[in-house]
Amino acid sequence: MPVSKEYVEYVLDQLSCLGPIAHKRMFGGVGLYFDGLFFGLIDDDIVYFKVDDITRRRYEAARTKPFQPGGEGPSQSSYYSLPVNVLEDLDQLKAWASEAVEVARRKASSKNARSAKRK
């Protein structure tokens, strides 16, 4: 689904509370990067943050939806939509975004460790 330029600018402005955020258009959406880590995305003017088995519970408790690029159906997504009220509250947003960055950092570290073992 399309992502509006205005919405991307709004999200980037809100996320500036975390620090410099890079973004890149991809597959009709926008990828969000902090310190080179892919921690979130925007699709159809909805923000999704990276989750793991621990942080997913917080999103499920907030009744947010998993990112499902292929439509509805059973999915164990690594990305969940951000509650709208969190996007509007900079203190909460910084906490949720920082958590998503840490999830991305842990996943990147575990991938690097697996790659090193194979060599």
Please name every model-derived segment.
Residues 1-119:
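Charge-dense, helix-prone N-terminal extensions
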